[in-house]
Amino acid sequence: LGKLQKAISCFQKAIEIQSNHAGAYNNLGNVFRELEESKKAIGYYEKAIQINPNHAGAYNNLGNALKDLGEHKKAISCYEKAIQINPNHSGAYNNLGNVFRELEESKKALGYYEKAIQINPNHTYAYNNLGNVFKDLGEHKKAISYFQKTNSIVSKEELLKYSYLLDGLEDYKKKLEKFVEKETCNRNVAAMAAYVSKKENIKNIYPFCKDPLNFVSIKNLKNVLTLTDNFSKNLLKRLETVHSIWEPKTTTTKGGYQTLINLFNTTDIEILKLQKIIEKQIIIYRKVYERSEDYFIKKWPHKCKFSAWYVKLLKQGHQKPHMHAQGWLSGVFYIKVPKLLNKYEGSIKFLLSSYDFPEDKNLPNLIHSPNDFDLVLFPSSLIHQTIPFNSQDRRHSIAFDLIPK
């Protein structure tokens, strides 16, 4: 955070010296977007464009910030404007592909990714994105061929997954051994390794978090911290003023609303109070597991940042199985949950699985039916989901990740 604040000061000084410095405004936008303050970033990108209407980079960056906020149509217009100014802007073509993939328009996405590669044959992201689209379409041989074209962590994750699904256990074990030599804390691979080791009854050699279900912590904070119903009312009142989106395309939320900005980038008293509570509980959590040899605990990052979001689920609302690959530790604080539900309705379910792997009902899982003021902490490599519920009441929660810097 210190370096980013210094960068902000430098760019502001540049503008103080030269008020029409479009590049400085664009760079300020980049810093605020990195700080997950996309609304602020948008203002700076727009100022850069106002000064220099031919600033293709600012249009591309503005598109990214708008996409962060779920403004897909506006983002598309910005990327198209960037390309109009600079027809060889491979990044804008790649970003157009990302938008159309989110909108589930795979054919359009393919065309834009291919164009990005045509302009820049070394565009790693575009190759990975092409692989992901073909994977979405079930064209696995094509997906593999694109993942093989790069040496990125993402492509290695996908090829490791395919080795188990298509080539069998022995090939997977060889590839995992090679992966461990270079990367020991990849959350996607940790999820995969935990699943395969249990399913195949073999030793889990991936050191990040070998048995993640053992690291789920559930604590009700109402009595521990004398939280009151007034606290939750004030918190909900504040959260209702934050812009949220129905079933955002980039999330697993179905039948509900979710915010896309980082809630913890705020000066709001109630939200900051909750953040401080969570920080203290994480210290306690680490103390509980301090003797673990798993790298999840042993190699806990020295510098982290929070990312938090609010989820409001309605009747039949749920979240599909997912994990938080960018996080280290993840969690949920339940503000207010529906009452009188049937067994497991509205519960959070933890399971040993990985993206693209089918759930194996013979493998262990953990289901928790939350109460108001419950705090649940767990490794970010652990797949989880919310089970649908039938109540007319709303289910209010704040989810968060602790992310290594």
Language model segments and positions:
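Canonical positions in the second alpha-helix
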Residues: 14, 48, 82, 116, ...
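Non-heme Fe(II)/2-oxoglutarate
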Residues: 205-297
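Residue-level recognition of tetratricopeptide repeat
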Residues: 21, 55, 89, 123, ...
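Conserved alpha-helical positions within TPR/SEL1-like repeat arrays
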Residues: 23-34, 57-68, 91-102, 125-136, ...
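Catalytic core of non-heme Fe(II) oxygenases with the double-stranded beta-helix
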Residues: 269-272, 276-279, 283-377, 385-405
